[in-house]
Amino acid sequence: MRYGTLGEEINTTEVTDEFETLQTIKRTKQNIVGWYFYSFSSEPFVVSAIATYIPLLLEQFARHNGVTLEDHSVHCTADHDKCVLGLFSNRIYIDTSSFALYTFSVSVFFQTLVVITVSGVVDIWNTVTFKRNVLLLFGIIGALSTILISRIYNTQYYMLAFLCILSNSCYGVVNVVGNSLLPLFVSEYLQHNSSSLDERDNVDILTTLISGRGASIGYSSALVVQIISIFLIKKSKSSENIQVATLFVGIWWLIWQLPMSWLLQDSPISADVTPEDMDNLSIHKPKKWIFKFSNLKHGWSSLFQALKHAKLLKDVVIFLVGWFIVSDSVTTINSTAILFAKTELKMSTLSLIVLSILTMINAILGAFTIPQFISRKFQLPGEKLLIYIILWASFIPFYGILGFVFKNIGLKHKFEMFITAIWYGISLGGLSAVSRSVFSLIIPRGQESTFFSIFNVTDKGSSILGPLLIGLITDYTHDIRYSFFLLFALLILAIPIFHLLDVERGKKEASSLQKIPIAD
């Protein structure tokens, strides 16, 4: 029998270690591709369906079942400017535009409850495989409920509202769990890429790069969906048939999430991996699957624990307060502008979809160029970049306010809406990419789902307030233009808050909290 020398054994070990490293890097790159599919499959829902189709459908259903503002015995038609919808056996009447805003506000409320509950369970079984299964489960439910929207009659406005709430709640879970994977993949890639370990800034660069690409891919898929939707609507029996577009969005979401089932996998555990590494990487050994109802409260207890240690998370608190205001106003700008264009400027459904397409194209441009070129060229840190994007976005409601002063400018004509869509798209894409990357840098490792659920509370949960206030303003004035005052004030208010944000200090805060156990 021949025994190898000590040198041969060492070489064999080195080859084995190198092979394991290459396999892990390969798996990480595959996971990143799978993460792109999460954005590619689900983004058309929030960008196309929630932002365009469903608000129009809600207003359309409300108008079909509504009456005129002046005389509640007269059925509302497309020729009437001001219509109201009777709810709860006509006990109360609301503006037909407000029905869409109130429904969205309620949907975000339920979305917030579901997201916090589910994210805690995800953090307990903190593996890529488990998170993938959660993504697929809620993605399938959300996609099917979106498809069902296309099958209801225009008299079923309560059912439409219910399906909107269900699908939006499912998307919230998909969004939070999907975003929580980003810092795991970045840490894992840099952990096994020796050429990058000497540069601390590579975490920031890689996070921003992947986040920007994900946002661009998501908006690109939404753009494709919008273009195909125009063709489908033109081929349908009615040019106002928006339900065929929601059908296509649901099918798109259902099909394109399937590649995640084989792309998102746990990486193999190397023999030299330390427990500290396992806390940061997506290579956790799965816990034994024993579900307890007590696990459902883990997200809430984790949330309260995180808030309890807010003194260690000064910059996270600053970010969330600022983002609560910005997300509320920017999200509400879209639904307000769509309803404004339809009710005040009388734009057709196809024209409104074109507006959405222009928004998507420029959102892709903003998500791609702002993090990768503008940020690098001018050496702008993420917190400063956010301030400039907010200033850019604030011009939209300001221009709408000018309509009270001037007769011919200030969103008085249809062509102005197309210019506004371009302007809005750039700000939307930039905010989407930069906000996720900045937040992922200042949260503790191993608690991504919980903290991204907090991010979702501010990102989506703030949308409870915005549409509610706009709905109340519209119900009181029956003129949605007045809502631009509120939107402009909110954006300006956020600027001094983000001026206080310090990302480098936030990283140290996150490292401190990472050492404090979160209660189960």
From Swiss-Prot:
It is a multi-pass membrane protein. It is found in: Vacuole membrane. InterPro entries: Atg22 (IPR044738), Atg22-like (IPR024671), ATG22/LtaA_families (IPR050495), MFS_trans_sf (IPR036259). Glycans are attached at N11, N193, N280. GO terms for biological process: amino acid transmembrane export from vacuole; autophagy. The keyword Transmembrane helix applies. Keywords: Amino-acid transport, Autophagy, Glycoprotein, Membrane, Transmembrane, Transmembrane helix, Transport, Vacuole. The keyword Glycoprotein applies. Its main location: membrane. The chain crosses the membrane at residues 32-52, 104-124, 133-153, 158-178, 214-234, 244-264, 316-336, 350-370, 386-406, 415-435, 454-474, 483-503. GO terms for cellular component: fungal-type vacuole membrane. Belongs to the ATG22 family. Vacuolar effluxer which mediate the efflux of amino acids resulting from autophagic degradation. The release of autophagic amino acids allows the maintenance of protein synthesis and viability during nitrogen starvation. This is Autophagy-related protein 22. It comes from Vanderwaltozyma polyspora (strain ATCC 22028 / DSM 70294 / BCRC 21397 / CBS 2163 / NBRC 10782 / NRRL Y-8283 / UCD 57-17) (Kluyveromyces polysporus). The lineage of its organism: Eukaryota, Fungi, Dikarya, Ascomycota, Saccharomycotina.
